């Protein structure tokens, strides 16, 4: 009898459970999507769509995506309050400078821009502690902006770093799509390329400001380069010449040329003779690459780089003063 009562009770319990399940409404949202936060479109999203994505074809990614940072970098999401400000600067001083009538013209960038732009709150030091202007693990079709959280359009040093990064990455994209004679360019300083920041970490150890880290550098000049990051590869060297030119005055570039050809001195005549030969070689490489890039930009982009330099620097300075 007890066994019958127990079986009856279990059967009744099962029926009640099935009835409850049939009355419960199913959630129309897929369980596959539950791991992802439901994102609502914001005013910032609409501004980005209208001012960056639609006119330039660039998708801006500012929400956290854990898989988009390179291994070993210290990155975190950007503060929302700075995103529009940094994108406005990129648009005005980077993209629109190229589109000026006296530079490349309205249609110059069509189909030639990165298709995705990632924003990060902090910097991008690599395994050697050297800050980078881009993410070397990404292709030239993808672009990154760092230090969004500390960006201030009225700070000349922060604006300098931003535009160095923007022009470096735009140059990388353009030389990817509009080919240059890499083999010929490589022969000029190919013996100096390191492929790593290990050898430049020590010379950069005392650099603190953006200008000190990314500006024209005497150590680099005396070895035939514009900047410290030029040592990494032919592509970096090429892009750095363009980027450094568009963010430096003609006098600053001229002074770098003088530095390249000025030998160090020593009390030992033999050492002095060696220094003189090193300076002669550095100057030769510096000016050959400078001429190579100027000719390439003129012939293939139909842009006078020196004229664009003056325009770019004036626009950057005016923008900083306005903010």
Predicted feature residues:
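Auxiliary, metal-adjacent structural segments of Zn-dependent hydrolase domains
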Residues: 25-26, 84-142
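Active-site recognition of the HExxH zinc-binding catalytic motif
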Residues: 156-184, 239
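Acidic/polar, low-complexity intrinsically disordered N-terminal segments immediately downstream
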Residues: 5, 21-103, 107, 284, ...
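Surface-exposed patches in mature extracellular/periplasmic domains of secreted proteins
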Residues: 97-121, 177-186, 252-262, 304-312
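Bacterial N-terminal signal peptides that target proteins for export
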Residues: 1-10
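Metalloprotease/metallohydrolase-associated module, dominated by Zn2+-dependent proteases
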Residues: 194-266, 270-277, 281, 285-290, ...
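Second-shell loop/turn segments in exported
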Residues: 72-81, 149-161, 224-232, 279
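C-terminal motif of bacterial Sec signal peptides marking the signal peptidase cleavage site
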Residues: 16-20
